[in-house]
From Swiss-Prot:
Native source species: Streptomyces avermitilis (strain ATCC 31267 / DSM 46492 / JCM 5070 / NBRC 14893 / NCIMB 12804 / NRRL 8165 / MA-4680)
Record carries keyword Lyase: yes
Pathway(s) where this gene product acts: Amine and polyamine biosynthesis; ectoine biosynthesis; L-ectoine from L-aspartate 4-semialdehyde: step 3/3
Catalysis performed (reactions): (2S)-4-acetamido-2-aminobutanoate = L-ectoine + H2O
Name of the protein in its database record: L-ectoine synthase
Entry's EC annotation: 4.2.1.108
Keywords: Lyase
GO MF term set: ectoine synthase activity
InterPro entries: Ectoine_synth, RmlC-like_jellyroll, RmlC_Cupin_sf
């Protein structure tokens, strides 16, 4: 059993701040735990815009605080995301988030991330793996 608090994560390599300055994420469960998914708490900052494309991952997102406009960049369809709303990127959709307020969400990724990922110039997380233990 693993028990981990946000306090345990703050100030460690599990507390990731995007190079873009638009979000930060606490990586609660990672690939090295070998459970088949990763779990994060992410905050996207008010007034920012983040374009993403999880070409290598499926992501489920549950908003727990704040409000944001989610745009499907492939169709142009817009959705207003508020607390209690979930969206699932089951088709690797290119999308853009525009938070009106600080937007806090819980995210699940499959395959799991290692914790070292940040979006590249295309908004993609690279598919990183943990080295095999000898």
């Amino acid at each position: 059993m693993i028990v981990r608090s946000f306090k345990d994560i703050e100030g460690t390599d599990r507390h990731v701040k995007a190079a873009s300055g638009t979000w930060e994420s606490k990586r609660i469960v990672l690939a090295k735990e070998k459970v088949g998914f990763s779990l994060h708490e992410t905050v996207l900052y008010a007034g920012t815009e983040t374009s993403m494309w999880y070409a290598n991952h499926i992501e489920a997102v549950l908003c727990v605080e704040g409000e944001a406009e989610l745009t499907d960049d492939e169709t142009g369809e817009k959705h207003w995301i508020t607390p209690g709303t979930m969206y699932l990127l089951d088709g690797h959709e290119r999308h853009t988030m525009r938070p009106k307020t600080d937007f806090r969400c819980v995210c699940v990724f499959n395959p799991p991330v290692t914790g070292r990922e940040d979006h590249d110039e295309n908004g993609v997380y690279p598919l990183l793996t943990e080295p095999e233990e000898v």
